[in-house]
Amino acid sequence: MIWILLVIYQLKHFIADYPLQGRYMLGKFKPWPDFVLPLLSHGLVHGVFTFAIAAFFKPLSVALALGLLDMSIHSVVDWIKANPSIGGRFAALSKNEMKSILSYVPTLGETEVKSKFGDQLRSNTFFWWALGADQLAHHLTHYLLIWMILS
């Protein structure tokens, strides 16, 4: 049963973090207080999925508690990743963002932009570490939830 739940939680994580995370939920990267509702709505999607999964194994009150736990942990982890003074300071720039910077500062060439904003480019090691730490925290949360469901 543990292997089935591991696969279910991988699918849950993918569906909730990618196809179901719409433009509104990406508002979690906005400054205070505008990020709060988008972040909580994204966490709620994770909580609803966990509630639905846990309801097959546990009483509804326990399933609800597990859903709220998942929502809370997911929201905090994503807040840490998105917060500009914590993980968000390592945000990576896409090619379009790079073009946007070049359009605002037309006197700079690509080399100058890279030297000024190099710590924010996709080659930024810390961006990938922050993203990896975020995913690790989510997976460890899933292991905890699976353990709680099966206990």
PLM ranges: what are they?
Residues M1-S151:
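Hydrophobic alpha-helical transmembrane segments
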